[in-house]
Amino acid sequence: MTANKRILVVTGGHRVALDDFLGAIAEICHDRGWVWAHATQPTAQAWLNPAHAGCWDAILLHDIPGLSLARGSEPIALPPGPGVAEALVGLLDSGQGVVVLHHAIAAWPAWEGWAEAIGGRFNYRPARLRGEDLPSSGYRMGAFTVEVADSLHPICAGIKDFAIDDELYFAPVLTDRVTPILTHDADMSGELFQDTFDVVTNGLSTGVTCAGHKADGGLHGGHRLMGWTTTAGISPVATLLMGDGPSTFANPMFRILLGNALDWVSSTHAKNKAAAQPFAVPLP
């Protein structure tokens, strides 16, 4: 662990218990001797630019840009504005470490390349990915055990299997793009998951679930992953799917995981590994 790291935390586009979340960030950074700053979308997007490469050791994304959400209305996928995707790809091509947290996997649904960059996507509405038409994703709250899949990975240092009460996703993951580090033991039966498009569009659930989805543990959902790593450009990226609310933010194991993830994506080892295995992120 290296002291004096600089962390940028990005939120916006989705509700979050901000005081609890930022309180957890403050304590994580204080314990590790780091400094941090908070930016909100859409103005935060200006930081996600190669012109600012090197300003931050790690960027934590807990936001959903590219999506218009309002209960009682259909969620609308918005393409990146002029130069936005190019700036993001340029930042990733500079070796910027990134951590994607929870609902941030729903970002930029109109840009397939972003799903490739982070290893998956939560679809608020039916969408197309890798040449397939996919249904909207699902969610449910539940108590489950987070399980360590790679005990040797630095993100899992000091982590043992732990119980948590958080939001689970029934959503695509690109299994050929990710290296699993965490799994979970929750029941992933599609009928347990509320259809997100139904809930958002109607303002509440009308009973539509993910039953009947072609669950395959990958593109069609149903996977048990809770965390993974990947490379985008020459940047190390870590994704943690937990992170819905105050009980998770207060969980000691979650705090260790998040701190470890920020530490790892900003490490020389992770950056060298990513540079040795680059991935060209497709532009829109």
List where the protein language model places each region.
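Extracellular ligand-binding/catalytic regions of CAZymes and related secreted enzymes
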Residues: 2-5, 21, 31, 200-284
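Helical hinge/lid and interdomain linker segments adjacent to catalytic or ligand-binding clefts
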Residues: 6-9, 18-100, 104-108
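Hydrophobic/aromatic beta-strand patches that form the interior of the parallel beta-sheet core
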Residues: 8, 99, 179-181, 238-240
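Residue-level signal for short, function-critical loop segments
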Residues: 13, 104, 243
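Conserved beta-strand segments of alpha/beta enzyme cores
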Residues: 33-37, 179, 236
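A glycine-rich, often tryptophan-bearing local segment used as a flexible ligand/cofactor-contacting loop or short
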Residues: 66-158
